[in-house]
Amino acid sequence: MNTIDMLELEQMKKNIPPFKPGDTVKVHVKIVEGDKSRIQAFQGVVIARQNGGIRESFTVRKISNGIGVERVFPLHSPSLDAIEVITRGHVRRAKLYYLRKLRGKAARIREKKYVAAH
């Protein structure tokens, strides 16, 4: 491993839950306004994950007042406070950009079913 990889490995966050495109997540973001800071939640469906390592980012889409809103979050950013996985979705694509064209019930994602071990 070279020195750049070692430096990046030190700066990467360790407490990131595993999530994939199709999962519904709640992202807690630190917002600084002047001298005050607060945490704002952004809940939506993960439609893409890009790159890898310290440069990794993911895109979350939600519908707010009938308008689609997408935000791209750097995965290892210090402004991310926490990521919660709300539901696991079952999709057959890595990039869910087709959801941008769908409205209403057509934009639903099937929930992944788990079989309990005996």
Curated annotation (Swiss-Prot):
Q: Name one GO biological process term.
A: translation
Q: Which GO terms describe its cellular component?
A: cytosolic large ribosomal subunit
Q: Does the keyword Ribonucleoprotein apply?
A: yes
One of this protein's Pfam families, by short name? Ribosomal_L19
Keywords from the UniProt entry: Ribonucleoprotein, Ribosomal protein
The entry lists its GO molecular-function terms as: structural constituent of ribosome
Q: Does this entry carry the keyword Ribosomal protein?
A: yes
Q: Family per UniProt?
A: Belongs to the bacterial ribosomal protein bL19 family.
Q: Function, please?
A: This protein is located at the 30S-50S ribosomal subunit interface and may play a role in the structure and function of the aminoacyl-tRNA binding site.
Q: What is this protein called?
A: Large ribosomal subunit protein bL19
Q: What is the lineage of its organism?
A: Bacteria, Pseudomonadati, Thermodesulfobacteriota, Desulfuromonadia, Geobacterales
Gene name of this polypeptide: rplS
